[in-house]
Amino acid sequence: MANHVSSLKRARQTVRKTAVNRANKSRVRGSLRSLREAIQKGDVKAAQEQYKATASALDKSVQKGILHANTASRYKSRLNARVKALATQAA
C-alpha cells in the first residue's frame, strides 16, 4: 500500500478515474451492441439512427482519452460500411 501523501492521493484519483472510464466504456459497448443488433435485424432506419449515436459516443470517448482516436475511427469505418451495405441491400 502507498505510504507517501502524494501516492495516497494518486491512488484515490486512480479509483475515481477508473470508475468514470469503466462507465464510459460500458456506455460505448452498449451503443455498439445496439447498433449491431439493429444491423442483424435488418432495420435500416434504426441502424442509421443508432450509427449516429454510436459515432457520437465513440468521439466523446476519444475526447475524454478513453479510446485511441484510431480505434474509434476503425470502429466507425467498419460499422458505417455495414450500415451502408444494409441500406443498399434493402433498396
Swiss-Prot record:
Entry-linked InterPro entries: Ribosomal_bS20 (IPR002583), Ribosomal_bS20_sf (IPR036510)
Pfam families the record matches: Ribosomal_S20p
Gene Ontology molecular function: any one: small ribosomal subunit rRNA binding
Gene Ontology biological process terms, A to Z: translation
Span list, region Disordered: 1-31
Record-stated family: Belongs to the bacterial ribosomal protein bS20 family.
Function recorded in the entry: Binds directly to 16S ribosomal RNA.
Protein name: Small ribosomal subunit protein bS20
Gene coding for it: rpsT
